[in-house]
Swiss-Prot record:
CDD domains: Hsp33. GO terms for cellular component: cytoplasm. Under oxidizing conditions two disulfide bonds are formed involving the reactive cysteines. Under reducing conditions zinc is bound to the reactive cysteines and the protein is inactive. Coiled coil: none annotated. It is found in: Cytoplasm. This is 33 kDa chaperonin. Pfam families: HSP33. NCBIfam families: PRK00114.1 (NF001033). Redox regulated molecular chaperone. Protects both thermally unfolding and oxidatively damaged proteins from irreversible aggregation. Plays an important role in the bacterial defense system toward oxidative stress.
Length: 294
């Protein structure tokens, strides 16, 4: 089933829903980073979460960055997302490998660890970005983001994220949802939705059956007057460029850049999101120094 992200409401606007299938998106991300199965599941969940939360931004110039690091062998995962469904990310240790957990599944929680925080940074074009941070709840990422929404944004939420890794290490199914109760929503409705989520199969199981994201949400919210508002195609993409790397080098300051110049070596800089390589020889670094002097 093709990747798609949709926004919807249920029960006369009492519930806000964002759901997505992200199989192709996550496949591209793990191909870039050459992930192990556990690394793929961790990065894939974060990329899916990023695409969902990015779609909640209001302005096309807004960005959101989500970072989780609990001291585990994954060495942290970071994603940056945009309103139109584009997302990029990286994992500190893409080859992280742990035994299966007690449920016989990839141990994402163990790879992430629990001794740390999940941090959400929203750049909304204001003087300072919004930064929200909460302790890691489980390391499974979905639970941690639900805890973040409830504590930091005071919005009771359910977050479901799933990544099914195939035997050939490709992604067989990936997707997720964020379900939020709006102010004034019926508490019994929240309890019913919680019960419903506990009873249904996992989102990756539903995707594997060939269900579209519309069909999945119709299934979850059966009899709850689901209204689909809009849809976009989420995508793994990196916006790095020579100009951005130039600005990053200039930002380290004249003194430090001059020291690099005086060494006379060609420097190789690698984008952590897409592994694109940028080479700066003696002449190119000299050009940047001249720009800084003007």
């Amino acid at each position: 089933m093709a990747d798609k992200l949709i926004k919807a409401t249920a029960k006369d606007g009492q519930v806000r829903i964002i759901g997505a299938i992200t199989t192709e998106l996550v496949n591209k991300g793990i191909e870039v980073h050459k992930c192990s199965p556990t690394g793929a599941a961790a990065l894939g969940r974060m990329l899916t979460a990023g695409s969902l939360m990015g779609s909640m931004l209001k302005s096309e110039k807004d960005t959101i960055t989500i970072k989780i690091d609990g001291g585990g062998e994954a060495k942290g995962v970071l994603v940056t997302a945009y309103p139109e469904g584009k997302v990029k990310g990286y994992i500190g240790n893409p080859l992280v490998h742990l035994p299966l957990n007690q449920n016989g599944k990839l141990d994402v929680g163990g790879a992430i660890g629990k001794n740390g925080n999940i941090t959400v940074i929203k750049d909304l074009g204001l003087k300072d970005p919004y930064i929200g941070q909460v302790p890691i709840y489980s390391g499974e990422i979905g639970d941690d983001l639900a805890y973040y929404f409830t504590v930091s944004e005071q919005t009771p939420s359910a977050v479901g994220l799933g990544v099914l890794v195939d035997k050939d290490l490709s992604i067989k199914a990936s997707g997720g949802f964020i379900i939020q109760m709006m102010p004034g929503a019926d508490e019994l409705l929240a309890d019913f939705i919680t019960y419903r989520l506990e009873e249904i199969p996992s989102i990756t199981e539903l995707i594997s059956k060939g269900m579209s994201i519309e069909e999945i949400l119709e299934f979850i919210f059966e009899g709850m007057d689901l209204k689909i508002l809009e849809g976009i195609v989420p995508e793994y993409t990196c916006d790095c460029s020579r100009e951005k790397i130039d600005r990053a080098l200039i930002s380290i300051g004249y003194k430090d850049l001059k020291e690099i110049y005086d060494e006379g070596k060609t420097e190789e800089l690698v984008c952590q999101f897409c592994n694109e390589k940028y080479f700066y020889d003696h002449e190119k670094i000299g050009e940047l120094l001249r720009i800084m002097n003007n």
